[in-house]
């Protein structure tokens, strides 16, 4: 009798995205159990190295969002323990999480990125560092956590930036606001998926819009001219390759269709640990490509390796 592969689904953690990680992890663990795997759900705490060393799984499916699962930390632990794992490796994870550095790498590879500055929280809190409208975001956080938009010159910088218990780090990325359609595309099995257009009532695709049922509407395929649609797909794969990503990644874009051709297309960021909840984008994009949720999760496990 063939031994069932033992998969440790790493979920939870201590980042601001813990709740989403728990939901992603549960959905994937349930899928793996349906597929016949032996599954252990591991809520990641700071003793994770000891826990995994004792557990000795065959594979780790990383379903962590934010630190320590998306910044290269958990990947380094898994490399040290010799446990094959899913998604991107140490370097690509750390690089993609550090938004300012990721932008530099993508721009060098010909992927258009938003104009922006990396500054201290104190600098951003005391004055307009560029003419509004602009977006303020943590250098190293995801799921639109800690993101603010300043639209008018008479507005003061967000008061939250003055908080003594500000949890999102002292370095902030301030980017010129890019108007237009919100688009997203993923890389699955080494190929770009279709493109989703995200329509929501909020100013930007924030945490609530991403993870609350009905928080946004998804148009798939996105209502774009064919050459623009294909350019989004091309740039998604180019960004994935430039950052050294592996497994599944997702790239987010804005497209201002008032600008001729594809000049209004801007890549906002690449997510190396995209959500896998019931409202997440990657499962929807995979389904459009004929890949069921269970098939997608099983592929992530079978694709796992070291040295990613």
Curated annotation (Swiss-Prot):
EC number: 6.3.2.4
Enzyme class: ligase
Annotated positions binding Mg(2+) 1: 252, 269
Catalysed reaction, written as an equation: 2 D-alanine + ATP = D-alanyl-D-alanine + ADP + phosphate + H(+)
Cofactor requirement: Mg(2+); Mn(2+)
Record key words, sorted: ATP-binding, Cell shape, Cell wall biogenesis/degradation, Cytoplasm, Ligase, Magnesium, Manganese, Metal-binding, Nucleotide-binding, Peptidoglycan synthesis
Cofactor: how bound: Binds 2 magnesium or manganese ions per subunit.
Domain ATP-grasp: start-end pairs: 103-302
A GO biological-process term: peptidoglycan biosynthetic process
InterPro entries for this protein: ATP-grasp, ATP_grasp_subdomain_1, D-Ala_lig_Van_CS, D_ala_D_ala, Dala_Dala_lig_C, Dala_Dala_lig_N, PreATP-grasp_dom_sf
Pfam family, one: Dala_Dala_lig_N
Pathway(s) where this gene product acts: Cell wall biogenesis; peptidoglycan biosynthesis
Function description: Cell wall formation.
Protein name per the record: D-alanine--D-alanine ligase
Organism: Rhodopseudomonas palustris (strain BisB18)
